Amino acid sequence: MMTDPIADMLTRIRNAVNAKHKVVEVPASNIKKSIAQILLDEGFIDGFNVTEDGKQGIITIDLKYGPNEEKVISGIKRISKPGLRVYARANEVPKVLGGLGIAIVSTSKGLVTDKVARKEGIGGEVICYVW
């Protein structure tokens, strides 16, 4: 039994990037699809698609690298964990590396980046940092 599926997804992405893989597969869920969509919108991955396998489905993520095979995702870190939840008010939403990275925040309007949360004046649970 997996206790933290989001941390598992982030670890799979981190390991695949460090091993220079082109794609990585993770078990699907709605929150993982939202995280993948944010990573795509922010330019950290090339794309993703969801395939049905008769159970929960699989998300295949196409990883992105620079022209000389340098990593686009240099770091990805889980912040709010099942044993220690981390919440931030609208005025406390953190900036990652002075704005170079993103924080993914779970709000009442779904998963959004730190920039969107600050702009709309909403806080929530800080899921992870990506830089």
UniProtKB/Swiss-Prot annotation:
Biological processes per GO annotation: translation
Keywords: Ribonucleoprotein, Ribosomal protein, RNA-binding, rRNA-binding
UniProt-listed Pfam families: Ribosomal_S8
Transferase found in the keyword field: no
Molecular function per GO: rRNA binding; structural constituent of ribosome
SUPFAM superfamilies listed in its UniProt record: Ribosomal protein S8 (SSF56047)
Function: One of the primary rRNA binding proteins, it binds directly to 16S rRNA central domain where it helps coordinate assembly of the platform of the 30S subunit.
Subunit structure: Part of the 30S ribosomal subunit. Contacts proteins S5 and S12.
Protein name: Small ribosomal subunit protein uS8
